């Protein structure tokens, strides 16, 4: 397994906890992430990007995945509702990524309507199978953003 450049399992406490820049759609482009690094962020994450678009090599989506050696560790975040596209996108990112982050937390209708993001929280076995397939396919650590969705009404895949 590729070493991410920091100990992903070391318990952090007090002053030793890393400062994260949370991924923000339409905001977390490369210049913004580099600025955050210069201002003290230890870890930055790309904005979430559709795995189907990445697997089809859509230029605009790959632009969101631009990285720079100053941005270490490099952590791209992907989302999607199609298992094959999620696995394909993760394997395509594996060489450049130090960690791959999966978004299972976005409640936006444009995401949940394709049974992605928070919608997958309503299908735990499907979510677990997706994560297992991605973890088995790549040699970098995989993390996930989730949400407690008890008050959300989400669509499920038929």
List each language-model region with its residue ranges:
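Conserved non-cysteine loop/helix-boundary elements of the Radical SAM core domain that shape
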Residues: 51, 114-125, 129, 152
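Non-cysteine beta-strand/loop elements that form the S-adenosyl-L-methionine
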Residues: 46, 99-107
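Alpha-helix-loop-beta-strand connector modules within alpha/beta enzyme cores
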Residues: 66-73, 121-142
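Single conserved hydrophobic/aromatic residue that forms the stacking wall/gate
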Residues: 151-158
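Glycine-rich, positively charged N-terminal anion/phosphate-binding segment
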Residues: 2-9, 13, 24-96
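Active-site-proximal loop/turn and secondary-structure-junction residues that shape catalytic pockets
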Residues: 50, 80, 106-108, 148
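Short beta-strand/loop segments at the ligand-binding rim of alpha/beta enzyme cores
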Residues: 16-19, 73-75, 138-147
